[in-house]
């Protein structure tokens, strides 16, 4: 989580984790399907900043999708920012996805929506390492997003995605925030694994408020993450 424009780049490999996805071919009820996932990861990182103080995290979520393209997602994870009173993140997203036919050969999938990031038990003010923080919304914030995904772009089964996220009062009262990202995924032969790479640029208005909670680990804007799932 972040919201300012520093000129630093970081590269990394996503920490190992295991994920179980349920109901791949979920039955439909009145046009609605439900899918879920459970994951255990050695470190929960969000846009380059650890959300679990470099410790393991347990995560899980459900998505309810309608045949029209509308969906509702519920997701949660254990978190640890090194402050008293918060150990759980709960996110709720409401969105819409469909195909945008640009030509006979170009039809990307678009995904737009709004998401609420909630942090149960997080207070509106606290002190970390002698640095005070006082924000009207605590750690909670809302964000709107949009993404285009181009399937089978370079290889069969691959995908290129470009997206943008915006919040008018980002995490820890760090004010206006923009996040731009591009990603690529492709199957690894016939192994059943998928390789993914992504680059993101985070622009914040108020980096100082974020640094209090993130413990100063915010000197990064462009992030390259390579992971296998």
Language model features with spans:
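Short loop/turn motifs that connect adjacent beta-strands in outer-membrane beta-barrel proteins
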Residues: 22-33, 69, 99-109, 136, ...
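Short glycine/proline- and aromatic-enriched beta-strand/turn motifs that initiate or cap beta-hairpins
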Residues: 24-80
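Residues that define the transmembrane beta-barrel architecture of outer-membrane proteins
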Residues: 30-32, 54-58, 86-90, 108, ...
């Amino acid at each position: 989580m972040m919201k300012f424009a520093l000129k630093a780049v970081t590269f990394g490999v996503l920490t190992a984790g295991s994920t179980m996805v349920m109901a791949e071919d979920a039955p439909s009820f009145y046009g609605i399907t439900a899918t879920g996932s459970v994951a255990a990861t050695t470190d929960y990182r969000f846009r380059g900043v650890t959300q679990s103080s470099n410790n393991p995290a347990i995560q899980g979520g459900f998505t309810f999708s309608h045949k029209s393209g509308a969906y509702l997602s519920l997701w949660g994870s254990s978190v640890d920012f090194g402050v008293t009173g918060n150990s759980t993140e709960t996110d709720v997203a409401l969105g819409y996805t469909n195909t945008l036919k640009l030509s006979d050969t170009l039809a990307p999938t678009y995904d737009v929506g709004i998401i609420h990031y909630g942090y149960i038990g997080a207070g509106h003010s606290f002190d970390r390492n002698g640095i005070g923080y006082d924000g009207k919304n605590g750690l909670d914030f809302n964000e709107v997003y949009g993404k285009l995904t181009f399937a089978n772009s370079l290889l069969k089964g691959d995908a290129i995605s470009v997206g943008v996220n915006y919040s008018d009062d980002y995490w820890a009262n760090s004010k206006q925030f923009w996040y731009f990202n591009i990603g690529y995924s492709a199957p690894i032969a016939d192994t059943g694994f998928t390789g993914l790479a992504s680059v993101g640029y985070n622009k914040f208005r108020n980096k100082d408020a974020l640094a209090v909670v993130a413990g100063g680990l915010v000197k990064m804007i462009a992030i390259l993450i390579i992971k296998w799932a």
